Amino acid sequence: MDFQLQAVDDNARAGLLNLAHSQVATPVFMPVGTQGCIKSLDATDAQEILGAKLILANTYHMYLRPGEKVVGQLGGLHRFAQFQGSFLTDSGGFQAFSLSGNIKLQEDGIVFKSHIDGSKHLFTPAKVLDIQYSLNSDIMMVLDDLVGLPAPLKRLEESIKRSAKWANLSLEYHKQKNRPSNNLFAIIQGGTHLKMRSLSVGLTHEGFDGYAIGGLAVGESVDEMLETIAHTAPLLPKDKPRYLMGVGTPENILDAIGLGVDMFDCVMPTRNARNATLFTYSGKISIKNAPYKLDNTPIEENCACYTCKRYSKAYLHHLFRAKELTYARLASLHNLHFYLELVKNARNAILEKRFLSFKKEFLEKYNSRSH
């Protein structure tokens, strides 16, 4: 993998990420395609309508169903999903943490029960990489020990040491495999404890293709999250991409870009879309509300998305009220377009050395009203 840093504006960065299946401009927002597709959308929607170059799929879910061997036999995720861009796959540690209810941490991995049928499984650092090799992921995440916040200091330290050990084992295993098209990212843990974050960086070997800031957006305040990012990002190698996992709102993303983060993913645009919340440059709207019943205007004037060029708020209001499946697609296309345009505009502002004024102008308008 080749990462070219093209411009820095204060701490905000613009770059190019060259992967086996695509060239990705950063900062980048990755739509979440947990099961190998973005909910309610297909590969044509992702590629041709949204122009997405990099989406996230989940190792835990693809392993349990349909199984990584099935995907591998069918040519990997790209052929299976007919997506010509790139895939980043999470290690599955977060899902084992959040879905199984009663995981058992061992020194060699995580024992968890399937949320589908209750069967027991063991994820080890090597096992999750083998799964991701079968999926043929462009970017693979190492297995980590995630801690919900708040957490005792002793538990945080345990998590850091275990995560660093697993990351370093993963790196050694990956080197033996000699698969340069499958890139490996480490994950930095430590909750909101800044000394623990520094320890996590110090324990994690150099030589990874990128570094993620994990363990945030799991119960801490926004101020704590931003303080943690501000502390951690400068500790990471300047010549490698930095990925903030699972974050977040438009405000969170712009704040994190300003702190030196390059990559983001979050279910918010699609989940909010399915639940009637749509993003506009002057704030969020709830399309289910009565005032939109006769509103013949698009979600946002001058929006170039597929939905706004064709349909009115009144039509979307009707589809949501009628529980039509088409609603989820049209709403998701709009919200994802909003997010992708946001990071694209942020990138252009960084290249033109005007990121802070861009962010200020965006937030002033965005926070002006929500209805």
From Swiss-Prot:
Positions of Zn(2+) binding: C303, C305, C308, H334
A GO BP entry: queuosine biosynthetic process
Protein keywords: Glycosyltransferase, Metal-binding, Queuosine biosynthesis, Transferase, tRNA processing, Zinc
EC number(s) recorded for this UniProt protein: 2.4.2.29
Gene3D superfamilies, A to Z: Queuine tRNA-ribosyltransferase-like
Record InterPro entries: TGT (IPR004803), TGT-like_sf (IPR036511), tRNA_ribo_trans-like (IPR002616)
Pathway: tRNA modification; tRNA-queuosine biosynthesis
Region (RNA binding): 246-252, 270-274
Group of enzyme by EC: transferase
Residues annotated as binding substrate: D90, S91, G92, G93, F94, D144, Q189, G215
Ranges in a coiled coil: none
A GO cellular component entry from the record: cytosol
HAMAP family given in the database record: Q_tRNA_Tgt
General function of this protein: Catalyzes the base-exchange of a guanine (G) residue with the queuine precursor 7-aminomethyl-7-deazaguanine (PreQ1) at position 34 (anticodon wobble position) in tRNAs with GU(N) anticodons (tRNA-Asp, -Asn, -His and -Tyr). Catalysis occurs through a double-displacement mechanism. The nucleophile active site attacks the C1' of nucleotide 34 to detach the guanine base from the RNA, forming a covalent enzyme-RNA intermediate. The proton acceptor active site deprotonates the incoming PreQ1, allowing a nucleophilic attack on the C1' of the ribose to form the product.
Family of the protein in this entry: Belongs to the queuine tRNA-ribosyltransferase family.
Protein name: Queuine tRNA-ribosyltransferase
Gene designation per UniProt: tgt
